[in-house]
Protein backbone atom coordinates (compact mmCIF):
# COMPACT_ATOMS: atom_id res chain seq x y z
CA UNK A 1 0.00 0.00 0.00
CA UNK A 2 1.43 3.34 -0.99
CA UNK A 3 2.28 5.74 1.82
CA UNK A 4 0.42 9.01 2.11
CA UNK A 5 1.92 12.35 1.46
CA UNK A 6 2.74 13.85 4.83
CA UNK A 7 -0.04 16.12 6.00
CA UNK A 8 2.59 18.01 8.04
CA UNK A 9 4.70 18.50 4.93
CA UNK A 10 1.97 19.97 2.75
CA UNK A 11 2.99 23.48 1.84
CA UNK A 12 1.45 24.55 -1.47
CA UNK A 13 2.40 27.98 -2.75
CA UNK A 14 -0.38 30.53 -2.36
CA UNK A 15 -2.33 30.96 -5.57
CA UNK A 16 -2.48 34.53 -6.81
CA UNK A 17 -5.80 35.67 -5.43
CA UNK A 18 -7.00 39.08 -6.50
CA UNK A 19 -8.15 41.01 -3.48
CA UNK A 20 -11.52 42.29 -4.54
CA UNK A 21 -14.27 44.23 -2.89
CA UNK A 22 -17.80 42.89 -3.14
CA UNK A 23 -20.43 44.79 -5.03
CA UNK A 24 -22.71 46.80 -2.78
CA UNK A 25 -26.30 45.61 -2.80
CA UNK A 26 -29.62 46.31 -1.14
CA UNK A 27 -30.66 45.04 2.27
CA UNK A 28 -29.40 41.56 3.12
CA UNK A 29 -31.52 39.18 5.14
CA UNK A 30 -31.45 37.74 7.60
CA UNK A 31 -28.43 39.31 9.34
CA UNK A 32 -27.32 37.83 12.62
CA UNK A 33 -26.17 41.18 14.00
CA UNK A 34 -27.97 44.51 13.75
CA UNK A 35 -24.81 46.48 14.50
CA UNK A 36 -21.08 45.74 14.43
CA UNK A 37 -19.40 44.55 17.62
CA UNK A 38 -17.14 47.13 19.31
CA UNK A 39 -13.88 45.82 17.85
CA UNK A 40 -15.28 46.42 14.34
CA UNK A 41 -17.32 49.54 15.03
CA UNK A 42 -14.23 51.30 16.37
CA UNK A 43 -12.58 50.65 13.02
CA UNK A 44 -15.37 52.18 10.96
CA UNK A 45 -17.62 49.22 10.20
CA UNK A 46 -21.12 50.25 9.17
CA UNK A 47 -24.45 48.84 10.29
CA UNK A 48 -25.30 47.64 6.77
CA UNK A 49 -23.19 45.09 4.84
CA UNK A 50 -20.73 46.88 2.58
CA UNK A 51 -19.39 43.73 0.92
CA UNK A 52 -21.09 40.90 -0.94
CA UNK A 53 -20.44 39.26 -4.31
CA UNK A 54 -22.71 40.42 -7.10
CA UNK A 55 -25.53 37.93 -7.58
CA UNK A 56 -24.79 37.88 -11.31
CA UNK A 57 -21.79 35.61 -10.70
CA UNK A 58 -21.98 33.83 -7.38
CA UNK A 59 -19.54 31.20 -8.65
CA UNK A 60 -16.70 33.72 -8.42
CA UNK A 61 -15.23 33.81 -4.91
CA UNK A 62 -14.13 37.05 -3.30
CA UNK A 63 -10.79 37.16 -1.52
CA UNK A 64 -9.94 39.72 1.12
CA UNK A 65 -7.52 40.27 3.98
CA UNK A 66 -8.64 40.70 7.57
CA UNK A 67 -6.55 42.19 10.39
CA UNK A 68 -7.77 41.57 13.92
CA UNK A 69 -7.58 43.76 17.03
CA UNK A 70 -4.10 42.41 17.80
CA UNK A 71 -2.79 43.25 14.30
CA UNK A 72 -2.74 39.63 13.13
CA UNK A 73 -3.51 39.45 9.41
CA UNK A 74 -4.51 36.63 7.12
CA UNK A 75 -6.72 36.08 4.10
CA UNK A 76 -10.25 34.82 3.64
CA UNK A 77 -12.19 33.60 0.62
CA UNK A 78 -15.95 34.12 0.59
CA UNK A 79 -18.40 32.17 -1.58
CA UNK A 80 -21.94 33.58 -1.60
CA UNK A 81 -24.98 31.33 -1.97
CA UNK A 82 -27.50 34.04 -2.81
CA UNK A 83 -29.23 37.12 -1.47
CA UNK A 84 -30.92 35.35 1.48
CA UNK A 85 -28.42 32.90 2.99
CA UNK A 86 -29.76 30.42 5.54
CA UNK A 87 -26.44 30.11 7.36
CA UNK A 88 -22.67 30.09 7.10
CA UNK A 89 -20.21 27.24 6.55
CA UNK A 90 -16.73 28.04 7.86
CA UNK A 91 -13.96 25.95 6.29
CA UNK A 92 -10.55 25.48 7.94
CA UNK A 93 -8.03 23.67 5.76
CA UNK A 94 -5.22 21.30 6.59
CA UNK A 95 -1.54 22.15 6.84
CA UNK A 96 -0.36 24.26 3.91
CA UNK A 97 -3.98 25.08 3.01
CA UNK A 98 -4.01 23.02 -0.21
CA UNK A 99 -7.74 23.55 -0.90
CA UNK A 100 -8.00 27.11 0.41
CA UNK A 101 -5.24 28.01 -2.04
CA UNK A 102 -7.34 26.82 -4.99
CA UNK A 103 -9.87 29.61 -4.47
CA UNK A 104 -8.25 31.77 -7.15
CA UNK A 105 -8.19 28.99 -9.73
CA UNK A 106 -10.79 28.31 -12.38
CA UNK A 107 -13.19 25.45 -11.74
CA UNK A 108 -11.32 23.35 -14.31
CA UNK A 109 -8.04 23.79 -12.43
CA UNK A 110 -9.36 22.81 -9.01
CA UNK A 111 -9.02 19.24 -7.82
CA UNK A 112 -12.24 17.30 -7.30
CA UNK A 113 -13.98 17.55 -3.97
CA UNK A 114 -12.12 19.54 -1.35
CA UNK A 115 -13.32 23.06 -0.74
CA UNK A 116 -14.39 24.35 -4.13
CA UNK A 117 -13.93 21.52 -6.62
CA UNK A 118 -16.71 19.47 -8.19
CA UNK A 119 -18.47 17.68 -5.36
CA UNK A 120 -16.80 19.88 -2.76
CA UNK A 121 -17.90 21.87 0.27
CA UNK A 122 -18.92 25.00 -1.64
CA UNK A 123 -21.09 23.09 -4.12
CA UNK A 124 -22.94 21.18 -1.40
CA UNK A 125 -23.37 24.14 0.95
CA UNK A 126 -24.35 26.61 -1.76
CA UNK A 127 -27.02 24.26 -3.12
CA UNK A 128 -28.63 24.38 0.33
CA UNK A 129 -28.48 28.14 0.72
CA UNK A 130 -25.32 28.44 2.81
CA UNK A 131 -22.56 30.97 2.26
CA UNK A 132 -19.06 29.56 2.69
CA UNK A 133 -15.97 31.31 4.01
CA UNK A 134 -12.53 29.72 4.06
CA UNK A 135 -10.13 31.36 6.51
CA UNK A 136 -6.38 30.88 6.32
CA UNK A 137 -4.54 30.48 9.61
CA UNK A 138 -2.74 33.67 10.69
CA UNK A 139 0.97 33.43 11.41
CA UNK A 140 3.97 32.60 9.27
CA UNK A 141 3.59 28.84 9.66
CA UNK A 142 0.09 28.82 8.14
CA UNK A 143 -0.98 25.90 10.34
CA UNK A 144 -4.02 26.03 12.58
CA UNK A 145 -3.02 23.56 15.28
CA UNK A 146 0.43 24.94 16.27
CA UNK A 147 1.48 28.04 18.26
CA UNK A 148 -0.63 30.70 20.01
CA UNK A 149 -3.95 28.90 20.00
CA UNK A 150 -5.61 31.67 22.02
CA UNK A 151 -4.54 34.20 19.42
CA UNK A 152 -5.89 32.06 16.59
CA UNK A 153 -9.19 31.59 18.40
CA UNK A 154 -9.48 35.37 18.79
CA UNK A 155 -8.54 35.91 15.14
CA UNK A 156 -11.19 33.52 13.84
CA UNK A 157 -13.89 34.88 16.15
CA UNK A 158 -13.24 38.42 14.94
CA UNK A 159 -12.96 37.34 11.30
CA UNK A 160 -16.41 35.72 11.51
CA UNK A 161 -17.83 38.89 13.06
CA UNK A 162 -16.37 40.76 10.09
CA UNK A 163 -17.89 38.34 7.58
CA UNK A 164 -21.30 38.68 9.25
CA UNK A 165 -21.18 42.48 9.20
CA UNK A 166 -19.43 43.27 5.93
CA UNK A 167 -20.50 40.32 3.76
CA UNK A 168 -24.04 39.99 5.12
CA UNK A 169 -23.54 36.39 6.20
CA UNK A 170 -26.24 34.83 8.35
CA UNK A 171 -24.67 33.38 11.50
CA UNK A 172 -27.87 31.98 12.98
CA UNK A 173 -26.62 28.60 11.74
CA UNK A 174 -22.86 28.15 11.67
CA UNK A 175 -21.21 24.92 10.55
CA UNK A 176 -17.49 24.58 11.24
CA UNK A 177 -15.98 22.25 8.62
CA UNK A 178 -12.38 21.15 9.07
CA UNK A 179 -9.87 18.95 7.33
CA UNK A 180 -6.85 17.42 9.06
CA UNK A 181 -5.12 20.21 11.03
CA UNK A 182 -8.23 22.36 10.63
CA UNK A 183 -10.26 19.60 12.29
CA UNK A 184 -7.80 19.49 15.17
CA UNK A 185 -8.07 23.23 15.73
CA UNK A 186 -11.87 23.13 15.68
CA UNK A 187 -12.30 20.22 18.08
CA UNK A 188 -9.45 21.05 20.47
CA UNK A 189 -9.59 24.83 20.66
CA UNK A 190 -12.11 26.79 18.62
CA UNK A 191 -15.35 24.91 19.27
CA UNK A 192 -14.87 24.86 23.07
CA UNK A 193 -14.39 28.65 22.95
CA UNK A 194 -17.13 29.42 20.40
CA UNK A 195 -19.91 26.91 21.05
CA UNK A 196 -21.96 29.18 23.31
CA UNK A 197 -22.11 31.78 20.53
CA UNK A 198 -23.55 29.28 18.03
CA UNK A 199 -27.33 29.57 17.89
CA UNK A 200 -27.48 26.56 15.57
CA UNK A 201 -25.30 24.32 13.43
CA UNK A 202 -22.28 22.45 14.76
CA UNK A 203 -19.20 20.95 13.17
CA UNK A 204 -18.17 18.42 10.52
CA UNK A 205 -14.63 17.09 10.90
CA UNK A 206 -12.74 15.26 8.15
CA UNK A 207 -9.43 13.47 8.49
CA UNK A 208 -8.91 13.85 12.22
CA UNK A 209 -9.79 16.01 15.18
CA UNK A 210 -8.90 15.37 18.81
CA UNK A 211 -9.97 15.99 22.39
CA UNK A 212 -9.29 19.39 23.98
CA UNK A 213 -6.01 19.41 25.90
CA UNK A 214 -6.95 21.70 28.78
CA UNK A 215 -8.81 20.38 31.78
CA UNK A 216 -12.19 21.99 32.24
CA UNK A 217 -12.63 22.55 28.52
CA UNK A 218 -15.89 20.57 28.69
CA UNK A 219 -17.78 23.35 30.48
CA UNK A 220 -20.49 23.45 27.81
CA UNK A 221 -24.02 24.51 28.67
CA UNK A 222 -26.84 22.01 28.54
CA UNK A 223 -28.44 24.10 25.81
CA UNK A 224 -25.32 23.89 23.63
CA UNK A 225 -25.22 20.13 24.10
CA UNK A 226 -28.82 19.90 22.92
CA UNK A 227 -28.85 22.31 19.98
CA UNK A 228 -25.50 21.64 18.24
CA UNK A 229 -24.76 18.71 15.93
CA UNK A 230 -21.26 17.20 15.97
CA UNK A 231 -20.11 15.00 13.08
CA UNK A 232 -16.96 13.04 12.20
CA UNK A 233 -15.91 11.44 8.91
CA UNK A 234 -12.46 9.86 8.70
CA UNK A 235 -11.30 6.92 6.62
CA UNK A 236 -10.38 3.62 8.24
CA UNK A 237 -7.13 3.72 6.27
CA UNK A 238 -6.15 7.11 7.72
CA UNK A 239 -3.64 5.41 10.04
CA UNK A 240 0.09 5.69 10.85
CA UNK A 241 1.04 2.88 8.48
CA UNK A 242 -0.20 4.96 5.53
CA UNK A 243 1.45 8.22 6.60
CA UNK A 244 5.11 9.15 6.22
CA UNK A 245 4.93 11.13 9.48
CA UNK A 246 2.91 8.44 11.31
CA UNK A 247 -0.19 10.61 11.60
CA UNK A 248 -3.20 8.73 12.97
CA UNK A 249 -6.22 10.63 11.67
CA UNK A 250 -8.54 7.73 12.47
CA UNK A 251 -7.34 7.52 16.07
CA UNK A 252 -7.53 11.29 16.59
CA UNK A 253 -11.06 11.39 15.19
CA UNK A 254 -12.24 8.63 17.52
CA UNK A 255 -10.62 10.38 20.50
CA UNK A 256 -12.57 13.50 19.59
CA UNK A 257 -15.86 11.64 19.19
CA UNK A 258 -15.43 9.84 22.52
CA UNK A 259 -14.64 13.10 24.31
CA UNK A 260 -17.69 14.97 23.07
CA UNK A 261 -20.02 12.04 23.68
CA UNK A 262 -18.71 11.78 27.23
CA UNK A 263 -19.21 15.54 27.61
CA UNK A 264 -22.92 14.98 27.01
CA UNK A 265 -23.56 16.20 23.46
CA UNK A 266 -26.82 14.61 22.35
CA UNK A 267 -26.47 14.90 18.58
CA UNK A 268 -23.31 13.11 17.45
CA UNK A 269 -22.80 11.12 14.28
CA UNK A 270 -19.80 9.43 12.73
CA UNK A 271 -18.93 7.43 9.65
CA UNK A 272 -15.69 5.62 8.93
CA UNK A 273 -15.53 4.92 5.15
CA UNK A 274 -12.89 2.89 3.34
CA UNK A 275 -10.72 5.94 2.62
CA UNK A 276 -7.29 7.25 3.52
CA UNK A 277 -6.20 10.77 4.48
CA UNK A 278 -6.11 11.90 0.85
CA UNK A 279 -9.03 10.09 -0.76
CA UNK A 280 -11.52 11.34 1.85
CA UNK A 281 -11.21 14.83 0.37
CA UNK A 282 -13.15 13.68 -2.69
CA UNK A 283 -16.13 12.96 -0.42
CA UNK A 284 -16.40 16.36 1.30
CA UNK A 285 -19.46 17.56 -0.57
CA UNK A 286 -21.32 14.29 -0.19
CA UNK A 287 -20.99 14.32 3.59
CA UNK A 288 -21.53 18.05 4.05
CA UNK A 289 -24.75 17.76 2.06
CA UNK A 290 -25.87 14.78 4.10
CA UNK A 291 -25.29 16.53 7.43
CA UNK A 292 -27.00 19.75 6.31
CA UNK A 293 -29.98 17.81 4.96
CA UNK A 294 -30.32 15.82 8.17
CA UNK A 295 -30.16 18.99 10.26
CA UNK A 296 -32.83 20.65 8.10
CA UNK A 297 -35.14 17.66 8.43
CA UNK A 298 -34.89 17.76 12.23
CA UNK A 299 -35.93 21.42 12.59
Where are the model-predicted features located?
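N-terminal secretory signal peptides
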Residues: 1-5, 12-20
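Primarily recognizes the serine-hydrolase "nucleophile elbow" in alpha/beta-hydrolase
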Residues: 165-166, 172-224
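Alpha-helical scaffolding within the catalytic cores
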Residues: 111-123, 159, 187, 191, ...
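The feature captures the conserved acid-bearing segment of alpha/beta-hydrolase catalytic domains
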Residues: 201-283, 287-289
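Alpha/beta-hydrolase active-site loop
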Residues: 145-167
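Cap/lid segment of the alpha/beta-hydrolase catalytic domain
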Residues: 126-151
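A domain-start/cap signature at the N-terminus of enzymes
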Residues: 2, 22-88, 189, 193, ...
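Short beta-strand element of the alpha/beta-hydrolase
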Residues: 85-104
Amino acid sequence: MAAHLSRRALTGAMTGLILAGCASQGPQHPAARTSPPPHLRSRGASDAPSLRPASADLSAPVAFSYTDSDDETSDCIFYAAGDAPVGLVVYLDGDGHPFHNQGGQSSAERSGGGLAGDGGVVEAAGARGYDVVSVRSPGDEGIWWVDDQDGKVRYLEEALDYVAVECGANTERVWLVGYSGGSEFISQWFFPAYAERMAGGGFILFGGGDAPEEEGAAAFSGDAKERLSLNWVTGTRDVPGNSVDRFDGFGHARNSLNYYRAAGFRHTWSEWPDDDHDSITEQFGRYVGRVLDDAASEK
